[in-house]
From Swiss-Prot:
Amino acid composition bias (Pro residues), ranges on this chain: 1-11
Protein name: Putative golgin subfamily A member 6-like protein 19
Biased composition (Polar residues): 51-62
Region Disordered: start-end pairs: 1-77, 467-529
UniProt keyword annotations, A-Z: Coiled coil
Record field: transmembrane: none
Regions annotated as coiled coil: 157-405
Disulfide bonds: none
Pfam families: GOLGA2L5
Coiled coil as UniProt keyword: yes
Family recorded in the similarity comment: Belongs to the GOLGA6 family.
Comp. bias intervals (Low complexity): 484-499, 517-529
Biased composition range(s): Basic and acidic residues: 467-480
Amino acid sequence: MWPQPRLPPHPAMSEKTQQGKLAAAKKKLKAYWQRKSPGIPAGANRKKKVNGSSPDTATSGGYHSPGDSATGVYGEGRASSTTLQDLESQYQELAVALDSSSAIISQLTENINSLVRTSKEEKKHEIHLVQKLGRSLFKLKNQTAEPLAPEPPAGPSKVEQLQDETNHLRKELESVGRQLQAEVENNQMLSLLNRRQEERLREQEERLHEQEERLHEQEERLCEQEERLREQEERLCEQEERLREQEERLCEQEERLREQEERLCEQEERLREQEERLCEQEERLREQEERLCEQEERLREQEERLCEQEERLREQEERLCEQEERLCEQEERLCEQEERLCEQEERLCEQEKLPGQERLLEEVEKLLEQERRQEEQERLLERERLLDEVEELLEQERLRQQDERLWQQETLRELERLRELERLRELERMLELGWEALYEQRAEPRSGFEELNNENKSTLQLEQQVKELEKSGGAEEPRGSESAAAARPVPGAPVPQGAWMCGQAGWTPQEHPGLSGEAVGTGEAAGGAEEAACHSFRAAENRELNITII
């Protein structure tokens, strides 16, 4: 019987061996990480069972590792845990790849060794057979060459026996030759297979060399990362001590935060009451708008009356000018009369002898004085009347200007109040959206303990700003009633045509340049309040996240 070549191992058996190797590699990895990780406290597993939290989400309930204990409070802990997980996954992948490659290499080497052994044994066996056949042929040749002694013809002669043996040996040689040819062909096929397998093995060896180089590089990186991890572990140990101190502080802060939540609930109730008040104010504003429309019609009528009064004043001015001209003429006449009287006096002085003439002169002088006094009194009365009329007109203009200013101020106040109402509504909407986002994000811890102090300060600032807004809202409610009463214009007071348009269609600084500074100032103040409210809202959101972490 010829020796049969060894077959490669069954694939199912190779898979089982690979699985066993993988399990062994995993066990080695676990043992390696247990050696590298620092001492875990004794009560860690108990805390895990009591809290019922998974090792990925639990942060303060159980101490899993120095990387896991700091997650949720510091960003460095989370980064270290992620790097550890990445390194573990990479290391596991590399270990699996090494195990699989080593298993494949071992299988291929075993196959090659078995094939080499079979080929060597077959060659030895063939050489041994050839040697035997050569010896047998040599013996036969020697026997045929030697002269045979004649023997008695008792039976078949030795020559015949030798011929029979030679024929039998030839047949055996032919069969052996055929077998040798078949074996040679098999050996050629096996040699081809061996060459192909050797080429594949060379390619695999090259790949393995590349993988080994990569593994060496990765091992160097892992060593560096291990050093970094050791440093991080030392830092984490220090952080654990700090965290224990911070937990006590956090308990105190939780109580404070609960009190702040109660305050916020009270503030929400107050905001709801303010919303109701704002709705009532909106209804009042609508009524005021209707009244203002009626007042517009009255103002138009007053404008028409004022135009008529202006025309009358112009006519009175013309009359006054005519009266002044007449008075000037009368003064000239009086001057002429005085000159004449002076001449008459001179003449009378010459005629002193005549007492009757003196009496006449005295009477004439008295009459002239009476006429002068009457004329002066008439002039004074007319001037007083004109002055009274002018003063009345000036007073009406002043009142009209004052009414315009008051009306403009009231319109600006109403606009500011409406803007504040809109801002308060926007703030309430933002608060509602913020509460919803906070309830959704309670399971995701984001910030650490160092940010808690800043966030608590921001929450205190938010409370102060809300109190200031409440105070300003309470102080502006009585102003609303006063502005509604003052918005009613005085009957008979003139109002310009573009005054109501600025309040109804939107005030523009081009129509009223004197009031643009006030409006801009109020807008800037409102913008600052909005920014402060947004900042405080963000602080409240961060505070809620810290509450969920605790």
